[in-house]
């Protein structure tokens, strides 16, 4: 049985931290708008602080996307390695594709396999409310 590397917990944590820092920066901006008691230096310091927090949130999101890319590359390598290893061990004859319809079906099956493997991550990046479903 194939065991593929799963790094989804790390991705969830990184994206959750990114969302947490982004919401913290928005709360600071709203507090800044409600209280007009700060001097110009105070506004500048809070602006710099909010800018740093937003950069941290963006870096967490970029790191999460790089973890997903790393996982896909490793999983594709493992799939190729285990497929060739299984073919050598079983010594089955290679299936010859006789018609173009069978060829297209084989390529569609391979594409479906790789697309199905990443469907959860695509949902994760497209749907920001996915974290709140977990929590």
UniProtKB/Swiss-Prot annotation:
Taxonomy of the source species: Bacteria, Bacillati, Mycoplasmatota, Mycoplasmoidales, Mycoplasmoidaceae
Origin: domain of life: Bacteria
Record's protein name: Uncharacterized protein MG074 homolog
InterPro entries: DUF5426
Pfam family, one: DUF5426
């Amino acid at each position: 049985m194939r065991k593929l590397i799963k790094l989804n917990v790390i991705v969830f944590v990184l994206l959750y931290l990114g969302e947490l820092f982004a919401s913290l920066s928005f709360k600071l901006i709203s507090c800044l708008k409600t209280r007009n008691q700060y001097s110009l230096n105070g506004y500048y310091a809070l602006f710099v602080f909010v800018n740093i927090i937003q950069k941290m949130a963006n870096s967490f999101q970029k790191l999460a996307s790089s973890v997903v890319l790393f996982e896909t590359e490793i999983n594709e390598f493992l799939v190729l390695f285990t497929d060739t290893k299984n073919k050598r061990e079983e010594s089955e004859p290679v299936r010859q594709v006789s018609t173009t319809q069978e060829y297209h079906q084989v390529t569609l099956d391979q594409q479906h396999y790789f697309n199905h493997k990443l469907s959860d991550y695509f949902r994760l990046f497209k749907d920001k409310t996915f974290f709140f479903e977990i929590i």
